[in-house]
Amino acid sequence: MEILFSISILALLFSGVVAAPSDDDVFEEVRVGLVVDLSSIQGKILETSFNLALSDFYGINNGYRTRVSVLVRDSQGDPIIALAAATDLLKNAKAEAIVGAQSLQEAKLLATISEKAKVPVISTFLPNTLSLKKYDNFIQWTHDTTSEAKGITSLIQDFSCKSVVVIYEDADDWSESLQILVENFQDKGIYIARSASFAVSSSGENHMMNQLRKLKVSRASVFVVHMSEILVSRLFQCVEKLGLMEEAFAWILTARTMNYLEHFAITRSMQGVIGFKSYIPVSEEVKNFTSRLRKRMGDDTETEHSSVIIGLRAHDIACILANAVEKFSVSGKVEASSNVSADLLDTIRHSRFKGLSGDIQISDNKFISETFEIVNIGREKQRRIGLWSGGSFSQRRQIVWPGRSRKIPRHRVLAEKGEKKVLRVLVTAGNKVPHLVSVRPDPETGVNTVSGFCVEVFKTCIAPFNYELEFIPYRGNNDNLAYLLSTQRDKYDAAVGDITITSNRSLYVDFTLPYTDIGIGILTVKKKSQGMWTFFDPFEKSLWLASGAFFVLTGIVVWLVERSVNPEFQGSWGQQLSMMLWFGFSTIVFAHREKLQKMSSRFLVIVWVFVVLILTSSYSANLTSTKTISRMQLNHQMVFGGSTTSMTAKLGSINAVEAYAQLLRDGTLNHVINEIPYLSILIGNYPNDFVMTDRVTNTNGFGFMFQKGSDLVPKVSREIAKLRSLGMLKDMEKKWFQKLDSLNVHSNTEEVASTNDDDEASKRFTFRELRGLFIIAGAAHVLVLALHLFHTRQEVSRLCTKLQSFYK
């Protein structure tokens, strides 16, 4: 009994010693808020991992004086509720940091409030986006999208691929996080041939199938996918149905997409797909933590890799916060500091340690992790094929592509024949202008003979590249030709003919530089004779009448002024009348010889001769222009207001040179509106019959078609530029268009402007246009008459005074 009593006393004393409070056992508490959607698997993992990590941390570091107290708030997936929860944590609970932000909207709201409260907000869900860089207190603790973008770009360059198709989710956080990748493509010269976006709420199977059919016609063989798990599962079901998981295609998934893909039900339709994943170094600590995390979660994790990534990042965030709190509180700063959050943020930024997810380092408010695992999805599991780190690949292994092929997907390789590659070229065979392109089958052998200006230019441009040409006639519409070339890439490589470069066709194919003059012209018949009264054409009737009236008026005024002092204007009334008319009309040819006595009449004649000089010059110039060029009375806005297709459609099926000429001669057509090459051939054959009176550069000329992304496009374009600079294109035009050097064809904008000016000058002058001259002349006549009447009145007054004095 005494022994039991003694043991009890010792136990009480021992427990008292252990439980007795001391200064060392009083912890300094720092509150941290977790704002997550507790109904989501990511939110549950974050909360569980955070608490488990703190428990492990303080179990090892039980001598630390500080403790991080976790305050959890459920955002319910609503950004507004998340904002309210964060406000409550900062204002009422006095939280010194917040962890959360599962969407871009939440991140922007929490980042805004963190700027005002000067409290750090840490997100483990969102990739780096440009719109969040402006917030100084917002830290993105995810993979480095800049390094990832460089890795994807480098991988595509290894395929020698110059164009890709980008497929992404139509949501703010997904589209924004794609910008860095797009910029890398542009910097490295990778062309985005097509792009498509899909929203979770509106992207059913039919919509996806329609969009993917449009993407299929692009010549790009590499597809980059950036979207959530639910959309990826829908996407690849459609991709498989459309035959886009065959040998000729490559699919690359971004890390944000690939991190959440684990289920076999999803990946079984994705065999051969390549994905970037956040790299997690394998260690016993990682295995131990993830094992305990699954037990805590009750094996409720939906995806293995995603739960590991989120859990390990949450673990490292908890540890770095606990370390940071301890560092600046050793000397009692937690109690003394008035701004714990600012000190905490500064300590986090300068923290360096090795965590479960890798080496921890913060730069520009984002976690730096340049290492990515590259995986290849197989029949049953994912297989690592390499690592991307520090700007280079390592541990590379062979890739098994879609269709179980081990060959790198490329554009269709040209068929080979001996030492030369065969280029299969579609030729427009329905053209009725053989000068441009002509396809004639040999009746005995059946072999097509292809000739014409377009064909000769193409053969000359392609000759340096050692291709054997196989011409295939095509008798359909040129718009359909572009679509055919883009969809039948295994059969055809290029197209040649009178093919105008248009924006619609450029959606399906790539064009070379134009090798013909650009624009549309107006052609009409030259006028042989313009009638016996052509000399009246330069002036309208009103101007002729006004001019005649002023000639007579000038003679009358000069006669009135001069007749009292000048003998040449005196005599009988008949002599005076003839002198008036003679003097007035003789000024037309400046043939007046009479010497004028008074200054006023001389002044009047000088002014009138100036007016006559302008009238005669205008008359001569206008008469000359009407004899030089036959004008077309066209409403240019009506003629050039439509597209090339609508204008040439007015001609129906009339395309042959002879048909044009005959219809113009017999008056069925007054003018022809068509592209410059067609009109050049017509004028070349009949240079004395027709003339081009105007042109507008609203079309892009003829070009050669190639499949999207073809390496031959820049090469052939350079050859076209070389032919033009050497004058060889002009020589070919002379050969096929005949007497081109004698044509009245305008080759540049300045000449067209000059022709327009000549056409305007050939219009009849009206009295309204030259009324300024007659106002000047009229003012001179009125002034001279007024002076004459004033002097006459003085003389009459003096005469009356003399008569009055005589009678007196």
From Swiss-Prot:
Pfam families: ANF_receptor (PF01094), Lig_chan (PF00060), SBP_bac_3 (PF00497). It comes from the Eukaryota. GO terms for biological process: abscisic acid-activated signaling pathway; calcium ion transport; calcium-mediated signaling; cellular response to amino acid stimulus; intracellular monoatomic cation homeostasis; potassium ion transport; response to abscisic acid; sodium ion transport. InterPro entries: ANF_lig-bd_rcpt, GABAb_receptor_plant_PBP1, Ionotropic_Glu_rcpt, Iontro_rcpt_C, Iontropic_Glu_rcpt_pln, Peripla_BP_I, Solute-binding_3/MltF_N. Belongs to the glutamate-gated ion channel (TC 1.A.10.1) family. It is found in: Membrane. Glycans are attached at residues 288, 339, 504. GO terms for cellular component: plasma membrane. It is a multi-pass membrane protein. Glutamate-gated receptor that probably acts as a non-selective cation channel. Can transport sodium, potassium, and calcium ions. Functions as a carbon and nitrogen regulator and/or sensor that regulates carbon and nitrogen metabolism and distinct physiological process such as germination through the control of acid abscisic (ABA) biosynthesis. May be involved in light-signal transduction and calcium homeostasis via the regulation of calcium influx into cells. May form heteromers. It comes from Arabidopsis thaliana (Mouse-ear cress). This is Glutamate receptor 1.1. Keywords: Abscisic acid signaling pathway, Glycoprotein, Ion channel, Ion transport, Ligand-gated ion channel, Membrane, Receptor, Signal, Transmembrane, Transmembrane helix, Transport. The lineage of its organism: Eukaryota, Viridiplantae, Streptophyta, Embryophyta, Tracheophyta. The keyword Transferase does not apply.
